[in-house]
Amino acid sequence: MYLQLLKSLNRLHPRAWDFVQLSRMDRPIGIYLLLWPTLSAVWIAGNGSPTLANVLIFGLGVVLMRAAGCCINDFADRKVDGHVKRTADRPLASGRVRPREALTLFAILVGVSFLLVLCTNSRTVWLSFGAVALAFCYPFMKRYTYYPQVVLGAAYSWGIPMAFTAAGGELPAGAWLLYIANLLWTVGYDTYYAMVDRDDDLKIGVKSTAILFGDADRSIILTLQLLSLGCLLLAGSRFDLGGWFHLGLLGAAACFAWEYWSTRKLDRESCFKAFLHNHWAGMLVFIGVVLDYALR
């Protein structure tokens, strides 16, 4: 139903679907992976009772900035996506969207996101420039470093300190623990994603942690995920989160164990499924946060 609704936009403009695909609105997994930790931070920063305004600002901001990130990512990769089986049919790589159009859509999405941030406070507004810089830089990092996933992790985690400054203007140590936890988690699941394209990336010279980690990939991913859970546990103690939160962490740990087991053959399909599966881990942690505050 969701996809049919998006495809119906072609009735308004014959090229609407091309721009839906460019912004990946037809593939909401990236929204989920960014949304759950951001909302968890909004809830914790609001001590379990966030304002409706902050929930809407950060919820819509996630959707818009993820779409903007996809636009600039495809712009940066437009000359290499055609050489990768999974990405050859993307709008820019296939010529359905022009580079200038992708940059225009990126600017529009960032502009609307900035209007949302203006509804918060000055400190959050200043932090938002870091979010834009990281979103813009990430796709170009694949040419120069084997750690583009770390830059993505920094970008995907930037909403966490912004959620705290929007709620009260302060950045407690626990907020940075949440930030580090999410960064580690993002590096882990995006390495699974990079493992899908590893053979193609080696041929065309694109760098990633999947290439860097080599045969130790799954073990390093699991280590990153466990470190992420450790940081969440420490953050939870600082924010007095208890049983329900810990239950959410156990659920996430079970997800990580399944991902490690299911990718033992290192085939593309299982690695991609493991990447998608991280959505459930993030959701379980968020549910744990919400229930821990709601059932006190």
Swiss-Prot record:
Pathway annotation from the record: Cofactor biosynthesis; ubiquinone biosynthesis
The family this protein is said to belong to: Belongs to the UbiA prenyltransferase family.
Locations listed in the record: Cell inner membrane
Listed cofactors: Mg(2+)
Known catalytic reactions: all-trans-octaprenyl diphosphate + 4-hydroxybenzoate = 4-hydroxy-3-(all-trans-octaprenyl)benzoate + diphosphate
Species of provenance: Pseudomonas putida (strain ATCC 47054 / DSM 6125 / CFBP 8728 / NCIMB 11950 / KT2440)
Superkingdom, taxonomy of origin: Bacteria
Spans traversing the lipid bilayer: 28-48, 52-72, 102-122, 145-167, 174-196, 219-239, 241-261, 275-295
Topology with respect to the bilayer: Multi-pass membrane protein
Function according to Swiss-Prot or TrEMBL: Catalyzes the prenylation of para-hydroxybenzoate (PHB) with an all-trans polyprenyl group. Mediates the second step in the final reaction sequence of ubiquinone-8 (UQ-8) biosynthesis, which is the condensation of the polyisoprenoid side chain with PHB, generating the first membrane-bound Q intermediate 3-octaprenyl-4-hydroxybenzoate.
Key words, A-Z: Cell inner membrane, Cell membrane, Magnesium, Membrane, Transferase, Transmembrane, Transmembrane helix, Ubiquinone biosynthesis
Transmembrane helix is among the record's keywords: yes
EC number: 2.5.1.39
Protein name as catalogued: 4-hydroxybenzoate octaprenyltransferase
Gene Ontology molecular functions: 4-hydroxybenzoate polyprenyltransferase activity
PANTHER family, per database record: 4-HYDROXYBENZOATE POLYPRENYLTRANSFERASE, MITOCHONDRIAL, PRENYLTRANSFERASES
This protein's record includes keyword Coiled coil: no
HAMAP family listed in its UniProt record: UbiA
GO biological process: ubiquinone biosynthetic process
Subcellular location, principal: membrane
GO CC terms of this entry: plasma membrane
